[in-house]
Amino acid sequence: MSESCPCCSGLQYNACCQPYLTHAATAAEPAVLMRSRYTAYVKHDVDYLIATWHPDLQPEKWRASLAESCQNSQWLGLTILATSPGKTPDEGYVEFAARYISETDSQRTEVMRERSRFLRQHNRWYYIDGVHVQTGRNEPCPCDSGKKYKKCCGQ
């Protein structure tokens, strides 16, 4: 029996993100690349994270900090909040919330919310950059608990 995919898609890992992490397939859209990159963080697959970061940004220079981030974080779940096209067909955005526990900081559940930008080059999507999004205290918590942020992950 196969394990559930860490990206929280509801699919089995071998039918979801595994083909991307093993380079048997390439992501056809930004949201799929986002899910596979999240799974790479969970699985500590730094090589995949580097391979899917836009090469113009020289991602190899981030290898050590990516490896440290993977090692020091326990990823708990991913929620895709929104997807939107960019100014051209080769640009797209994915807003997500990822829950994690940082083992070096507080040992409490944190939520990282980001609007990531992806570019397609030579028929492959790449992560290019992202902007962290603040969740308002009275907004619904991005973890999908149904509670306000201040009563949930924002405590």
UniProtKB/Swiss-Prot annotation:
It holds the Pfam family SEC-C. InterPro entries: NTF2-like_dom_sf, SEC_C_motif, UPF0225, YchJ-like_M. It comes from the Bacteria. Signal peptide: none annotated. SUPFAM superfamilies: NTF2-like (SSF54427), Sec-C motif (SSF103642). NCBIfam families: PRK01617.1, PRK01752.1. Belongs to the UPF0225 family. This is UPF0225 protein PC1_1977. It comes from Pectobacterium carotovorum subsp. carotovorum (strain PC1). The lineage of its organism: Bacteria, Pseudomonadati, Pseudomonadota, Gammaproteobacteria, Enterobacterales.
